Amino acid sequence: MNTSLISTKSDSTSVHSRPTQEELAAKTATFLQKGLEGAANTRKAYRADIAGLESWLQENGMGVLPIGPAPLAAYLSDLAGHQKWATISRKLAAIRKWHRLRKHPDPGHDEAVRLVMEGIKRSIGTEPQQAPAFEIDSYKQSVRAIPPTPTGLRDRAMLLVCFAGAFRRSELVALDIESVQFTRQGAVLSYRGSKTNQHGHTEQKALFFSPDPETCPVRALQDYLSLLSRTTGPLFIRIRKGEQITDERLSDKQVARVTKQYLGEDYSAHSHRASFVTIAKLNGADDSQIMQQTKHRTRAMIDRYTRVQEVVKHNAAMKLGL
């Protein structure tokens, strides 16, 4: 036997201290909790949903959490009078998860609750309200009118990056300065975590120089960054009265407010994303190119965004001669 092939040294790299049963149980419980809780934005929405339920229970004298199927069915029925299907479904998911996390019986598993939800679905429908898309000419006109103040430079950059990058507002405000890399063609923005990427994988979006310097997302971003006396930290930040620049990260609600301020009350922050898909599609971009920027996992959402525009653009009713 060739004993030289046999190592006489202990392999310290393959040996690790074994956790105790208590440590392993605690670790397992931690991972289970994280798996149940879901993404940060989902947890935030769920907390608000539970707070709303607690207020409703108190106002209607129906006790406190945890609840059973009967009060849950009553709550869902009440919501059906003023909420959309998607909102009701999310609230139900939050309530069910709250009970599961605390090892209470899941009231949403009850047959009566499921039948109530089926009745609500049939009554109010499930079609989500689509964020309106804007016309590119009116959008560019609105952006050009933004004054070159510190707040204006921030808002111009924020709107153009949101549109050209097809960002969700939560993704936009989560960007850091160090996540921006300028290139000869424009810029690459890196970020981690999104609605369709809940495991924190790094994703990237590209911005390109535009012929018009007033509506170029890359130049707008460069102009805004020249205001900030730092190279790390939040990209889009609060600016106080008197144009005092802070290092406080902007909230996603501010993206919605700024959108309405410059584009009009009919538009939401999500209109940038909807408009990106609609305008790119009508200008000849294929679905794979669009999905490269939006990070949609399926073409179903692309079809939803462009449905109304396609009805108008490709329709024989224009050729009736009336």
PLM region spans:
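Extended, non-catalytic subsegments within catalytic or DNA/protein-binding/adaptor domains
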Residues: 1-322
